[in-house]
Amino acid sequence: MPQDVRFDLPFETPVSKHLESARARHLRWVWEMRLVHSREGFEEYRSWDLPQAAARTYPHASADDMVVLMNWFSLAFLFDDQFDASRPDRADRIAEVARELIVTPLRPAGTPPRVACPITLAWTEVWKHLSHGMSLTWQSRFAASWGRFLEAHCEEVDLAARGLEGTLGLVEFTEFRRRTVGIHHSIDAGERSRGFEVPAQAMAHPVMERMRDLAADTIGFMNDIHSFEREKRRGDGHNLIAVLRRERGCSWQEATDEAYRMTIARLDEYLELQERVPQMCDELRLDEAQRDGVRLGVEAIQHWINGNYEWALTSGRYAAAKEGAVATAELAGRGSVDDLLTV
């Protein structure tokens, strides 16, 4: 089964020692912020085990910061599931909420949202903590990556609302997937989790830019493989395996094998570029402190590639079968048990 597909990743990453204590605080917060309304929705959310994802991708965060990062994961993942195929007009509300999420980092931290719902209220609180202590340069970079991700999500929802979800060709899809996977700003958050910043000149270098793109591709493709059963069950055509099968007229297994090959190719190219990082630092004439920032930035990418992979192998989010209210919601074309876009 796709969720069981294994990759031989060349690096291991730690898991935060704060996982269990932060998990308890986080789950209370999710309920208090009404990011889940029902017992069924809460149990489904718990099965995803997003706290493990945060603990693996940001293993060096402090106890308090780990809770903030878990909280951020919750609102982002839950917002991703808000489209309802039986209500195409839902796309307009999603776009309205997405615009609010995009502009929040551009306002003074803590400014109440103009569009109020559980998702925007939660993001306002999270951003106040997530941005604390970071430079305007970092905040602007994060906001740009976050905005591109949310805009791409709206494009995806709009395609689904118009019945065009499965119409992208492979080249177009892979470029689109790089934006919808939401990895660039997630790697940026790795800097916040350890209290450092990658020098701006390194971030602008073609080697670092390509490494981040390849990391996004690698993670996005692995995610498409591991989530395939869930997305096939929901009729979601925004998946690499589905695109390959449609474009090449092959079997599901052949499409899965090709998706695996494409993932390995992206990972191999990433590893080749990673070996060129010292040369990049020499070229930019970085001092020791700046080189440390680059080194930690590369570790942040590794934490995301390996941490997300390890989490996806066991997360209930990608389980092959669902029961009860969750199964009913999926059969009705809803991605979520609870509506989080209204007050």
Curated annotation (Swiss-Prot):
The record marks 81, 156 as: Plays a critical role for substrate recognition. Mg(2+) 2 binds at residue 84. The lineage of its organism: Bacteria, Bacillati, Actinomycetota, Actinomycetes, Kitasatosporales. Its cofactor is Mg(2+). One of its GO terms (biological process) is terpenoid biosynthetic process. Binds 3 Mg(2+) ions per subunit. It comes from Streptomyces viridochromogenes (strain DSM 40736 / JCM 4977 / BCRC 1201 / Tue 494). The record marks 77 as: Plays a critical role in the stabilization of intermediate cation. Belongs to the terpene synthase family. Pfam families: Terpene_syn_C_2 (PF19086). Pathway: Secondary metabolite biosynthesis; terpenoid biosynthesis. It catalyses: (2E,6E)-farnesyl diphosphate + H2O = 7-epi-alpha-eudesmol + diphosphate. The Asp-Asp-Xaa-Xaa-Asp (DDXXD) motif is important for the catalytic activity, presumably through binding to Mg(2+). Substrate binds at residues 177, 230, 317-318. A motif (DDXXD motif) lies at residues 80-84. This is 7-epi-alpha-eudesmol synthase ((2E,6E)-farnesyl diphosphate cyclizing). Keywords: Lyase, Magnesium, Metal-binding. The keyword Lyase applies. Mg(2+) 1 binds at residues 80, 84. Catalyzes the conversion of (2E,6E)-farnesyl diphosphate (FPP) to yield the bicyclic sesquiterpenol 7-epi-alpha-eudesmol via a 1,10-cyclization, which requires the abstraction of the pyrophosphate from FPP to yield the (E,E)-germacradienyl cation. The only accepted substrate is (2E,6E)-farnesyl diphosphate (FPP). It is an enzyme of class 4 (lyase). Its EC number is 4.2.3.169.
